[in-house]
A protein has these predicted regions:
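N-terminal Rossmann-like NAD(P)+-binding subdomain of aldehyde/semialdehyde dehydrogenases
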Residues: 1-136
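General beta-strand structural signal in soluble alpha/beta enzymes
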Residues: 119-122, 140, 170-172, 205-211, ...
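Conserved small-residue-rich beta-alpha loop and adjacent elements
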Residues: 120-192
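Short internal beta-strands
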Residues: 166-176, 290-297, 374
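Conserved NAD(P)+-binding/catalytic subdomain of aldehyde/semialdehyde dehydrogenases
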Residues: 200-289
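A glycine- and small/hydrophobic-rich beta-loop-beta segment
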Residues: 280, 284, 292-368
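C-terminal core of ALDH-fold dehydrogenases
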Residues: 344-453
Length: 453
């Protein structure tokens, strides 16, 4: 059951975010770490040791950690053979293939329209500008978790390809074998639907590995896995901690947290639709967040009833039973303006505007990973087929971060090509600033090019 909050109590509890470093680690996870390492250590230290070992021993360490943590067969190939990719695509049922093809096409067409080009000007005494260059090699982490996510392959790989990245690499955890009881892979094989998605968009370099060890391999490289320039993709706590620790040696897209959605709805919204949208996000995992903001108590109570009714027939009700009372709820606001204010405070990954005039309300929104305008632009379409990538900032980072886009897969090189006259004119200014900073060698370098020399 979704709890109904007033604004003040929501500010004190539901809308209050914990700092990223205050992640609550379940006791079962600490027990597993202790069993693996033979001592009681936290996840940060565990990840640090794994990364250090991968960096020092390469493939040998990668295989050992994959076997210890994921029961990965010691004789299984790390890289998925091309024939296995093609076979997975050929075996994909036609309805699923058609859906993925349409999704890939829409994603590609969306990102082809994103401006991305070098530029130059001759108005400042020569030629100044910026070269836009694609990254050469990127690694995409595709989580398996509670379900395989072929959509994440499309939403990450296609923007990279549009940006011109030459080598797009996918890593994904192998599947659990029947009866393993581990929740982790022991077959040595990635879910076929993920492989099919890779083949569909032309990704040919795919590795069966997950967790911190996969991030370490991508960041530092091993004998079998060449290092990448930047790592993308969400994952569990260990993946997130690993990305944080390798940053600097390699680029990262960000630190993904549990998925979250916020719905602002007025009295015109349909309770059943609003409830369905909240449940769609809350079913992701037990830490997912789904919050409704509305000035209508009548709607709030109707949605509360609908959530309970629809939940009864959903197969992931066990997850919903934890995520709904945990980080989700309904907040009664004074009006839509206050709802927009609370949204900007929370900065959600997804914001759905189920109101009579979503365009007017969107003018008051500053912080959100993506805005879904009206009841017909519901968030699930954004998850799969609308066009923009579903990889969006979480944990309040929508205050300063953006959804995944082609700019994440390029870097900018500044160009300076001044003519002699301009150089002679501005070199004395550079020398003056350099001497003010106490950098005499800088100043003398400028003096050689000044008009007086």
């Amino acid at each position: 059951m979704l709890k109904i909050y007033d604004v003040e109590s929501a500010r004190r509890g539901l809308l209050k975010r914990n700092p990223p470093d205050e992640t609550q680690v379940p006791p079962v996870m600490l027990d597993r770490i202790a069993a693996t390492f033979g001592e009681r250590i936290g996840p940060e230290e565990a990840v640090k040791r794994i990364l250090r070992d991968i960096r020092a021993r390469g493939d040998l360490a990668l295989r050992e950690w994959s076997q210890r943590l994921d029961n990965f067969p010691t004789d299984a190939p790390l890289r998925v053979p091309a024939a296995e990719l093609d076979a997975a695509l050929a075996a994909l049922p036609q309805p699923e293939r058609e859906a993925l093809e349409v999704a890939a096409q829409r994603i590609r067409e969306f990102y082809r329209r994103q401006p991305l080009s070098s530029w130059f000007t001759n108005d400042l005494g020569g030629t100044l500008g910026q070269f836009i260059r694609p990254l050469k090699r990127v690694g995409l982490y595709v989580p398996a978790g509670t379900a395989p996510l072929p959509s994440t392959v499309l939403m990450s790989a296609v923007p990279a390809q549009v940006a011109g990245v030459k080598d797009v690499v996918v890593v994904a955890p192998p599947r659990s074998s029947p009866g393993s009881g581990t929740g982790h892979g022991s077959t040595g094989q990635i879910s076929p639907v993920i492989l099919a998605a890779c083949a569909l968009v032309g990704v040919r370099e795919v590795y069966a590995m997950g967790g911190a060890q996969a991030i370490g391999a991508l960041a530092y490289g091993t004998e079998s896995v060449p290092a990448v320039d930047k790592i993308f993709g969400p994952g569990n706590l260990f993946v997130t901690l690993a990305k944080r620790q390798v940053f600097g040696a390699v680029g990262i897209d960000g630190l993904a947290g549990p998925t979250e959605t916020m719905v602002i709805a007025d009295e015109h919204a349909r309770p059943a639709w609003v409830a369905a949208d909240l449940l769609a996000q809350a079913e992701h995992d037990v830490l997912a967040s789904a919050i409704l903001l509305t000035p209508s108590r009548k709607l709030a109570e109707a949605v509360q009833v609908e959530v309970g009714r629809q939940m009864e027939t959903l197969p992931r009700a066990d997850i919903l039973a934890q995520s709904l009372p945990g980080q989700s709820g309904i907040i009664i606001t004074r009006d839509l303006d206050e709802a927009a204010e609370l949204n900007n405070l929370y900065a959600p990954e997804h914001l759905c505007l189920a109101v009579a005039d979503p365009w007017a309300l969107s003018e008051k929104i500053n912080n959100a990973g993506g805005i879904f305008m009206g009841e017909h632009s519901f968030e699930v379409l954004g998850d799969y087929v609308a066009g923009p990538s579903h990889v969006m900032p979480t944990g309040g980072s929508a205050r300063f971060a953006s959804p995944l886009n082609v700019w994440d897969f390029v870097h900018i090189i500044s160009l300076i090509a001044l003519n002699p006259a301009t150089t002679a004119e501005i070199a004395p200014l550079a020398a003056r600033i350099a001497r003010a900073e106490g950098l005499e060698a800088h100043a003398r370098s400028a003096d050689f090019r000044s008009a007086k020399s």
